[in-house]
């Protein structure tokens, strides 16, 4: 009887552990693909300005606007190039052109202009956050995309404290 009870406890414990691993997709049930269904990897084929890029999606060009940041204008019609706009654009070109990036979408995937909205990851680094940290973008969020708001705002505060680029005055 004692042997059966011990065996039953071991089986129940194993079922619980495997169930938890299955629900969290860890252990032997971990997905081989992307870590999140809201993420995809693309090659950056062109940089429009500091916060807008074009990626190759299955042979088609896709215009992408980075969520949570707003860099000074450089290409907006009827708008002069704003201070640090060229620096932000050059920074993005230097880091992202011809690079494979991982895109992470939030709740709304397109803006009113039809651009894809995403967080851009270069390796393990979120590029949107990097722009704010370098003082080359202001944190700017629109409903309903707030996933990394606190993180990007913290990066901006750090740049402000250090008086980097757009915060230098």
From Swiss-Prot:
TM region positions: none
Top-level taxonomic group: Bacteria
Gene3D superfamilies the UniProt entry points to: 2.40.50.90
Pfam families the UniProt entry points to: SNase
A GO molecular function held by the record: nucleic acid binding
CDD domains from the UniProt entry: SNc
Catalytic-site annotation from UniProt: 65, 73, 115
Compartment(s) where it occurs, according to its Swiss-Prot or TrEMBL record: Secreted
Cofactor note: Binds 1 Ca(2+) ion per subunit.
Keyword Hydrolase carried by entry: yes
Thermal dependence of activity, per record: Active at 37 degrees Celsius. Retains activity after heating at 100 degrees Celsius.
Signal sequence residues: 1-26
Keyword tags: Calcium, Endonuclease, Hydrolase, Nuclease, Secreted, Signal
Entry EC number(s): 3.1.31.1
Family according to the record: Belongs to the thermonuclease family.
Name of the protein described by the UniProt record: Thermonuclease
Organism from which the protein derives: Staphylococcus hyicus
Gene name of the encoded protein: nucH
